[in-house]
Amino acid sequence: MVDFILNAQVRSDLGKGASRRLRRNAGLVPAVVYGGDKEPQSVTLELREIAKLLENEAAFSHVIALNVGGAKETVLIKALQRHPAKGFVMHADFLRVVADHKLTAHVPLHFINEEVAVGVKQSGGEISHTISEVEVSCLPKDLPEFIEVDMAKVELGQIVHLSDLKAPKGVELVQLAHGNDLAVANIHASRVVKEEGSEEGAAE
């Protein structure tokens, strides 16, 4: 399902110098579209348009309708090059999406029930996130906007791993499939509790 739309124009003026001129004089961003059974294509996007799109976190894990000079492509954002100081997009890579071919994409994690987690509410612990996104493999129609991490039953000292997550039907966690059951989050003793314990020990 396509929820986002971007407009682009075919780019014939290539090279680093041309890219700098585009950004400086026209407010345009150079980009490349690749994948599928077509040749890579160089395009330009309006900086304002892609900046507005990226304000929505879901754009990074959604299929995008890219209109290239009247022709339509369905794509995913695969890479962004940003200005090191100002943060604006300097270059973008888009991967063509084929409906019946599995794709890989990075999907954000949404942590829920952190305030009522057993290790927080009953033991005064603090939650640490080890990763904020996961790489998934699925058909385009099954690509989730995010994956939830329910912290409600997590106790003090407990670690949540990829194997504890509930991936939607048809979605495979790439690292887990390769035997890497990565840590996602944990609940540890808060610094305040640790410091109080140290002070009490010193007093004794």
UniProtKB/Swiss-Prot annotation:
<dbReference type="Pfam" id="PF01386">
    <property type="entry name" value="Ribosomal_L25p"/>
</dbReference>
<protein>
    <recommendedName>
        <fullName>Large ribosomal subunit protein bL25</fullName>
    </recommendedName>
</protein>
<dbReference type="InterPro" id="IPR029751">
    <property type="entry name" value="Ribosomal_L25_dom"/>
</dbReference>
<keyword id="KW-0597">Phosphoprotein</keyword>
<feature type="modified residue" description="Phosphoserine">
    <location>
        <position position="123"/>
    </location>
</feature>
<comment type="similarity">
    <text>Belongs to the bacterial ribosomal protein bL25 family. CTC subfamily.</text>
</comment>
<dbReference type="Pfam" id="PF14693">
    <property type="entry name" value="Ribosomal_TL5_C"/>
</dbReference>
<dbReference type="InterPro" id="IPR001021">
    <property type="entry name" value="Ribosomal_bL25_long"/>
</dbReference>
<keyword id="KW-0699">rRNA-binding</keyword>
<keyword id="KW-0687">Ribonucleoprotein</keyword>
<dbReference type="GO" id="GO:0003735">
    <property type="term" value="F:structural constituent of ribosome"/>
</dbReference>
<dbReference type="InterPro" id="IPR020930">
    <property type="entry name" value="Ribosomal_uL5_bac-type"/>
</dbReference>
<dbReference type="InterPro" id="IPR020056">
    <property type="entry name" value="Rbsml_bL25/Gln-tRNA_synth_N"/>
</dbReference>
<dbReference type="GO" id="GO:0022625">
    <property type="term" value="C:cytosolic large ribosomal subunit"/>
</dbReference>
<comment type="function">
    <text>This is one of the proteins that binds to the 5S RNA in the ribosome where it forms part of the central protuberance.</text>
</comment>
<keyword id="KW-0689">Ribosomal protein</keyword>
<keyword id="KW-0694">RNA-binding</keyword>
<dbReference type="InterPro" id="IPR020057">
    <property type="entry name" value="Ribosomal_bL25_b-dom"/>
</dbReference>
<dbReference type="InterPro" id="IPR037121">
    <property type="entry name" value="Ribosomal_bL25_C"/>
</dbReference>
<dbReference type="InterPro" id="IPR011035">
    <property type="entry name" value="Ribosomal_bL25/Gln-tRNA_synth"/>
</dbReference>
<dbReference type="GO" id="GO:0006412">
    <property type="term" value="P:translation"/>
</dbReference>
<comment type="subunit">
    <text>Part of the 50S ribosomal subunit; part of the 5S rRNA/L5/L18/L25 subcomplex. Contacts the 5S rRNA. Binds to the 5S rRNA independently of L5 and L18.</text>
</comment>
<dbReference type="GO" id="GO:0008097">
    <property type="term" value="F:5S rRNA binding"/>
</dbReference>
